[in-house]
């Protein structure tokens, strides 16, 4: 069995887990998330503990059990505490402004870049060069952050662009004459 799947997921008191056949839903203070569990993975809900075991001895089933356990753990943490990602804009004239569910970015192009956030993701802009994205869904949050970063990825010579706040951009030396 997968080493990840061996450890059970503990469910806090504020989180409700519902299991209908192979569909699992997790409800908490930050929202509700759902997951379709693969047929080769068996989920047991006993008290405030979820355990995941493969239905057969196949190697793929072991891997699926570990993956499912990790996804469900992220769902439980997401609906109870939530996740956040911070992005930083580096460059002269690079600005960000949040209006409702739209992020307006000025990234040195001849036009402003408007990004509409999907449902379930909220945004804050503490300053004109910082973006804080928050969501209960870790996968969706990472996807949104990657899409915003892709508008102007950090370049290696001056480091200009949109980067994650903890990202280290490897710098190159300019060409010598």
UniProtKB/Swiss-Prot annotation:
Cited SUPFAM superfamilies: Ribosomal protein L6
Amino-acid biosynthesis listed as a keyword: no
Keywords carried by this UniProt record: Ribonucleoprotein, Ribosomal protein, RNA-binding, rRNA-binding
GO molecular function terms attached to this record: rRNA binding; structural constituent of ribosome
PROSITE patterns named in the record: RIBOSOMAL_L6_1
Any single GO BP term: cytoplasmic translation
Gene3D superfamilies attached to this UniProt entry: Ribosomal protein L6, alpha-beta domain (3.90.930.12)
Keyword GTP-binding listed: no
GO terms for cellular component: cytosolic large ribosomal subunit
Quaternary structure (record): Part of the 50S ribosomal subunit.
Function according to Swiss-Prot or TrEMBL: This protein binds to the 23S rRNA, and is important in its secondary structure. It is located near the subunit interface in the base of the L7/L12 stalk, and near the tRNA binding site of the peptidyltransferase center.
Family per similarity comment: Belongs to the universal ribosomal protein uL6 family.
Protein name: Large ribosomal subunit protein uL6
Gene source species: Cellvibrio japonicus (strain Ueda107) (Pseudomonas fluorescens subsp. cellulosa)
Gene, per the UniProt record: rplF
